[in-house]
């Protein structure tokens, strides 16, 4: 297994999700199981994990799909070779669905121009903005169908845990990583 550091927010959110579903004991066992199978110390970003799997340095990793989208879109022969050297799996499709990270927007209470801020957020949820965001950043849109390189990965069942729950569970998630020896 190749992974990023446990201090990365992606992994903290993932652990918070596991914690919410499996409870403290189940999440601790999961983290210990992953950490005990590391092929190397946690390092790099998701692209580094994907490249490590493609090169055979490790057999499996967890990565955000937009990093795969970047490799799909790059056009570089070495990136095509990386994509050709991996298999993409969306886990937990028969039960809770795949954990997802989100990009969000909000308006702070002290915002000087709340009305325009709200209009901007409303625009961000339009079909046009979601398409631009999906194609420009290679992320699955919140609203509508995926377009661009990411669309080749297909659809998947998403974990429905609220992002607010993930925030509440972050502190405990970090503690479980520490106990598991996942640096």
Q: Which functions belong to the PLM regions below?
A:
Residues 1-7, 123-146:
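Periplasmic-binding protein-like
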Residues 147-183:
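Extracellular/periplasmic bilobal clamshell ligand-binding domains
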Residues 3, 106-109, 161-163:
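Active-site rim elements
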Residues 32, 47, 51, 55, ...:
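Solvent-exposed, polar/charged alpha-helical surfaces in well-ordered, non-transmembrane soluble domains
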Residues 15, 100-113, 132:
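A bilobed periplasmic-binding-protein/Venus flytrap-type ligand-binding module shared by bacterial periplasmic
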Residues 2-6, 10-13, 17-91:
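Ligand-binding pocket segment of bilobal, Venus flytrap-like solute-binding proteins
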Residues 8-9, 25, 44-47, 62, ...:
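Soluble non-cytosolic domains of exported or imported proteins
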Residues 77-99, 108-110, 145:
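Short beta-strand->loop
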